[in-house]
Amino acid sequence: MQASELLQRIRSNRAPVIIDPRSEVEFKRGHIPGAINAPVRKILLNMAQLPKDRNLEMVIACMHGQRAVMAKWLLALYGYRNTALLEGYLEGWQKADLPWEKAAS
């Protein structure tokens, strides 16, 4: 999914579930508003807080793509079929100066 489409859908309250597979520390430093932190290792161990509905549309994004690709593959193994990667990943999202949320310290 392109960043511009995701942003438009976030703003119109039609956003897919946004999965951020980075570590909790990285996630707290900043993420797409509304994203769910589901580190790859937690997905692998089936311990991530994922939606129960495996048909929900999901967009997966990490900083450069490696963990997003792994997360997408693991989610497919667990039966999540409606998943997409964010084009340009979080690096592209930040370069485009799109909304970015940080955890409260």
Question: What name fits each language-model region?
Answer:
Residues 1-17, 24-57, 63-105:
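Rhodanese-like catalytic fold shared by cysteine-dependent sulfurtransferases
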